[in-house]
A protein has these predicted regions:
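A short, Lys/Arg-enriched interface patch at domain edges and termini
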Residues: 51-70
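A composition-driven signal for long, intrinsically disordered, charge-rich low-complexity tracts
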Residues: 11, 47-48
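Short aromatic/basic micro-patch
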Residues: 6, 46-47
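Intrinsically disordered, low-complexity segments enriched in small/polar residues
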Residues: 9, 40, 63-64
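Major-groove DNA-recognition helix of helix-turn-helix-type DNA-binding domains
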Residues: 16-46
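Polyanion-binding surface elements
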Residues: 1-28, 54-59
Length: 70
């Protein structure tokens, strides 16, 4: 994935295995990367792919008892 690539909610769901409603809940709780608006003033959003991948990597590192990117 390109560092600057944006992915929509379906892609985020596919990468994480988490439901749409839970993704938004985690965002509200500051526990998941926030989406970016695709158009100023619009309602369509997407996530920065590298931020989602970093979040996934951190979950794996937590499971393995270490920090991400060690």
């Amino acid at each position: 994935m390109s560092k600057d690539q944006l992915i929509r909610i379906t892609g985020v769901k596919n990468l994480t295995g988490i439901s749409k409603s839970y993704i938004y809940q985690l965002c509200q709780e500051d526990r998941f990367p926030m989406p970016v608006k695709l158009v100023p003033g619009g309602t369509s959003v997407a996530w920065v792919a590298s931020e989602v991948q970093d979040w996934i990597d951190a979950r794996i590192a937590e499971r393995d008892g270490g920090a991400a990117n060690e």
